[in-house]
């Protein structure tokens, strides 16, 4: 075999080793240390939080400031962090999160992620399932889990090599604790923000306290189901270990229009606590 043929085959072999077959960029290995795979596309699934609602000074979705796929420098999103390591993801960050979305809406978003062939998928859902008009209207825990499983199954079936990050629901009860004696927050909440939790926000009566605790308990139950669903998914799913729920946020991290959704600083905080460091699971 001629020498240039040998060299050509060697180059092809190196190129093959540098790609894992999914299109993910892989840095060169150092010794026996495994290479880190950086996705070249991603999708965000969820509700108004991930849609960046209220993060751009008005009460509309503002995807550019999403903790997941945002492009704005004010929020060091997952997309921006990945882009620093893999420029191929530029323009390939898809945000399918919708204000008002519940777990029942997640499967349609998952199908969109499949159509986009997303190599990295973030999931933050459940706040609206708890923020019903009445406590009895909250999504039952078993139903919630069934809907989460259906969406994750859609991703796994069509994108078995993609990485999935499932994020915990924020501690909405803490939000009430922080704002129930804040005049501006109370005025905003009285417009109908998360009524199961925030209705009659200044009351410290037994019935209202019991209602709020029911909502808090339901969110805890949802988070347990999210963790279990991710565990059942397998090694390609990463749970945030409750990091978002455990954030000790202040009212400075929510917008001062509805006193509910994260502002740009809040979105940046979400990006920080959910960032896995590298996407190699």
Where are these regions (language model features)?
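Functional beta-strand-loop-alpha-helix junction segments that form "active/interaction loops"
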Residues: 91-103
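Flexible, glycine-rich phosphate/dinucleotide-binding loops
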Residues: 51, 102, 173
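Alpha-helical scaffolding within the catalytic cores
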Residues: 75-78, 105-113
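Alpha-helical cap/lid subdomain in secreted, periplasmic
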Residues: 108-257, 261-264, 272-281
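Secretory targeting and sorting signals
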Residues: 1-25
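Residue-level preference for short coil/turn positions at secondary-structure junctions
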Residues: 37-38, 89, 117, 160, ...
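Serine-esterase "nucleophile elbow" of acetyl-processing enzymes
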Residues: 23-93
